């Protein structure tokens, strides 16, 4: 039978509940347990798929095509497991499913209420994850902050789960801010106390408190929190600021977070083996010299919009003992008159995914500059599309070449809607997930990087390359090195006589892991390091 851990947050948002949950998952897996992780978000959007990157950050895509919260990227990177749509649930999805069930008559004329109908639906998501994943421990992060009105059904649901399963099968971890007042030079525990008081009023006694702080707290601070929050002093854990988030599991290991959880859940495991994670962190600390990536994007004001891309670059850099330096370029600031000057010192250029026509011409110029000046280039999804459009304009003498996403007239549609897609709604109209086998052409850079002729990568797009232009571009020297043969969709392009010029229609950033960078990122970083 699965055991359950619930992670809540108090005082303020952005304290690192996701990293705390991920770190615990890392430790439990290192102890020999199978772990599954979930995120419950209190917003009313059905999923993050149509949310603005400026408000939500990146949309992380799972193997089975789930458009999920960016915390799932942390989960997968920390526990090195493929999660599913079941790992991300919003209040909007819960309410939609409940209302649809009522409209179908599933409730037999009952009065539909938050308790029990909404809370039962939330509990079912947790229990279903336990049943289908076969995991020993389910770790569920509750989004938002305790006290928010939107979070209350989730708090009530996990309270009921504890009642149903018993304390020996459920652990509550509360992450809260240990406030430091610079004026008086002292730490204040009152915000944590009030946050726990709020939890207690909702029927939940936390078992472990993780206090976010800049440095380790004193024995006196922990004793005070212990006294007022009804937990042993040993169950007060410091989440201190670290240079790298990947050091946090080791910090939690030193404070025995996993041991506290295992003891309460009455689980006996083998010795926790952190050797591979320690070696990874040693790589990070040994990475002194920088490598620079010029990042030409649409949403650079909020770097979380590209979280997995950034982490993938970092992870690849550590393989060469290099740390990442990013030169951020707003795509819509590049134009014909300034792009050469702006990009003249670029060591490597990356154009990531995105939607809409803003900044497209700037991205096209960035890919053109990389192509013509032998600068390593990696284009992801949109970045692959604009690179192909740029080549078509120059090599086929088609100045009107474009995508129907940006030029609705479709005069020269190098990219067009994926066949069979209904475009009436934005939500649910994308090609999603890793269901599509990419067959890689023999003797190409892609084959060398992957070491395989077949790969499965994750997608998130609604436009595809128009094969009417394939032969003409091949004759000019563009190599279509990866194809989804079933529907003849182009997945990878590359230039053979270039240090590194590769574009993928899929998103390789979603499968990079510590100690296992995605091959495209590793090849891109290696090209930057070696390109003189």
Curated annotation (Swiss-Prot):
Residues 1-267 are annotated as: Amidoligase domain. ATP binds at residues 14-19, 71. Pfam families: CTP_synth_N, GATase. It catalyses: UTP + L-glutamine + ATP + H2O = CTP + L-glutamate + ADP + phosphate + 2 H(+); L-glutamine + H2O = L-glutamate + NH4(+); UTP + NH4(+) + ATP = CTP + ADP + phosphate + 2 H(+). GO terms for biological process: 'de novo' CTP biosynthetic process; pyrimidine nucleobase biosynthetic process. PROSITE patterns: GATASE_TYPE_1. SUPFAM superfamilies: Class I glutamine amidotransferase-like (SSF52317), P-loop containing nucleoside triphosphate hydrolases (SSF52540). Allosterically activated by GTP, when glutamine is the substrate; GTP has no effect on the reaction when ammonia is the substrate. The allosteric effector GTP functions by stabilizing the protein conformation that binds the tetrahedral intermediate(s) formed during glutamine hydrolysis. Inhibited by the product CTP, via allosteric rather than competitive inhibition. Mg(2+) binds at residues 71, 141. Belongs to the CTP synthase family. CTPSs have evolved a hybrid strategy for distinguishing between UTP and CTP. The overlapping regions of the product feedback inhibitory and substrate sites recognize a common feature in both compounds, the triphosphate moiety. To differentiate isosteric substrate and product pyrimidine rings, an additional pocket far from the expected kinase/ligase catalytic site, specifically recognizes the cytosine and ribose portions of the product inhibitor. Homotetramer. This is CTP synthase. It comes from Mesoplasma florum (strain ATCC 33453 / NBRC 100688 / NCTC 11704 / L1). The gene is pyrG.
């Amino acid at each position: 039978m699965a055991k359950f851990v619930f992670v809540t947050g108090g005082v303020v948002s952005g304290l690192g509940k996701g990293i705390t949950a991920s770190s615990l998952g890392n430790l439990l897996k290192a102890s020999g347990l199978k772990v599954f992780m979930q995120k419950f978000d209190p917003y009313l959007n059905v999923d993050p798929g149509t949310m603005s990157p400026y408000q939500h950050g990146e949309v992380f895509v799972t193997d089975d095509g789930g458009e999920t919260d960016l915390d799932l990227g942390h989960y997968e990177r920390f526990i090195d497991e493929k999660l599913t749509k079941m790992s991300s649930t919003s209040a909007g999805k819960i309410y939609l499913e409940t209302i649809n069930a009522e409209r179908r008559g599933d409730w037999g004329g009952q009065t539909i209420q938050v308790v029990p109908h909404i809370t039962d639906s939330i509990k079912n998501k947790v229990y279903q994850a336990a049943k289908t994943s076969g995991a020993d421990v389910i770790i569920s992060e509750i989004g938002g902050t305790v006290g928010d009105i939107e979070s209350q059904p989730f708090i009530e649901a996990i309270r009921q789960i504890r009642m149903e399963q018993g304390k020996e099968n459920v652990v509550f971890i509360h992450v809260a801010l240990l406030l430091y007042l610079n004026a008086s030079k002292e730490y204040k525990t009152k915000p944590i106390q009030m946050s726990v008081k709020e939890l207690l009023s909702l029927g939940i006694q936390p078992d472990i408190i993780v206090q976010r702080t800049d440095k380790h707290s004193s024995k006196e601070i922990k004793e005070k929190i212990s006294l007022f929050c009804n937990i042993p002093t040993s169950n007060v854990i410091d989440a201190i600021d670290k240079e790298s988030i990947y050091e946090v599991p080791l910090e939690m290991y030193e404070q025995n977070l996993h041991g506290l959880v295992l003891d309460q859940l009455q689980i006996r495991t083998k010795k926790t083996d952190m050797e591979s994670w320690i070696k990874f962190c040693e790589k990070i600390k040994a990475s002194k010299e920088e490598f620079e990536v010029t990042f030409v994007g649409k949403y650079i004001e909020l770097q979380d919009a590209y979280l997995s891309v950034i982490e993938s670059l970092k992870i690849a850099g550590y393989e060469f003992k290099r740390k990442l330096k990013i030169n951020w370029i707003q795509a819509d600031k590049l134009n014909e008159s300034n792009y050469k000057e702006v990009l003249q010192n670029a060591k490597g250029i990356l154009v990531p995914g995105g939607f809409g026509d803003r900044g497209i011409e700037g991205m096209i110029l960035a890919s053109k500059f990389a192509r013509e000046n032998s600068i390593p280039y990696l284009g992801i999804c949109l970045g692959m599309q604009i690179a192909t459009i740029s080549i078509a304009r120059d090599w086929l003498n088609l100045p009107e070449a474009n995508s129907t996403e940006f030029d609705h007239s479709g005069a020269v549609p190098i990219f067009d809607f994926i066949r069979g897609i209904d475009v009436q709604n934005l939500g649910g109209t994308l090609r999603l997930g890793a269901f599509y086998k990419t067959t890689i052409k023999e003797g190409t850079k892609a084959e060398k990087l992957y070491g395989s002729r077949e790969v499965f990568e994750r997608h998130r797009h609604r436009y595809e390359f128009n094969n009417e232009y394939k032969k003409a571009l091949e004759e000019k020297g563009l190599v279509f090195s990866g194809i989804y043969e079933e529907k003849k969709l182009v997945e990878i392009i590359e230039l053979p006589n270039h240090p590194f010029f590769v574009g993928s229609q899929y998103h390789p950033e979603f499968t990079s892991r510590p100690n296992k960078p995605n091959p495209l990122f590793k090849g891109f970083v290696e090209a930057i390091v070696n390109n003189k």
